[in-house]
């Protein structure tokens, strides 16, 4: 997997690790319209699958038409997201990327991390295939950003992933029980050997 995507996957996996399948279903403040930790992950996974489908179509059909030009709005969004790494606020997710109750089984944090890695890796293999076949040409059309090259697609998924990493962290802080801190150090050698702290005077 490309290093820039690997970093996002590792951060996501670390954030959900240790959460049980009950906690990953909880909504902040009990409000159903606020996504649970699993729903945040599902949204990302659906995005990876949608991108993978577009890449597979392009690999099967051949090059994207060079007549396909980006609009001024698409150029502006590319500048904002791909160059400055900022997602515009208030933009609703596509219907295809909205988590639907029951479409995924309830799973724990480790399984969610594995799911993110599996889907990201599958998408990245298609990025590699497109780069080999099309080079630096645009390979697929993003619904908002227009036609993108492989490097731009990777950049988008990094920015999008980091945006939802912040959301995921906030969700877990609100719904997860307090984690018990690990002991700073184990028992000392004296404690292990049961040596008395003071010896009686002779």
Predicted regions and their residues:
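Aromatic-glycine hotspot motif
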Residues: 1-202
């Amino acid at each position: 997997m490309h290093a820039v995507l690997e970093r996002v996957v590792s951060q996501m996996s670390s954030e959900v690790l240790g959460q049980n399948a009950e906690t990953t279903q909880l909504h902040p403040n009990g409000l159903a319209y606020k996504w649970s930790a699993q729903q945040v992950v599902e949204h990302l996974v659906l995005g990876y699958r949608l991108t993978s489908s577009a890449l597979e179509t392009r690999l099967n059909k051949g090059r994207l038409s060079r007549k396909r030009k980006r609009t001024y709005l698409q150029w502006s969004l590319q500048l904002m997201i791909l160059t400055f790494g900022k997602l515009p606020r208030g933009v609703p997710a596509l219907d295809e990327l909205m988590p639907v109750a029951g479409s995924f089984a309830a799973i724990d944090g480790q399984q969610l991390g594995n799911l993110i890695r599996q889907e990201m890796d599958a998408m990245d293999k298609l990025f590699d295939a497109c780069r080999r076949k099309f080079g630096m040409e645009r390979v697929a059309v993003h619904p908002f950003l227009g036609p993108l090259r492989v490097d731009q697609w990777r950049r988008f998924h990094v920015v999008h992933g980091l945006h939802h990493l912040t959301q995921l962290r906030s969700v877990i802080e609100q719904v997860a029980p307090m984690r018990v801190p690990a002991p700073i150090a184990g028992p000392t050698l004296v404690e292990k050997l049961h040596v008395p702290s003071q010896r009686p005077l002779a």
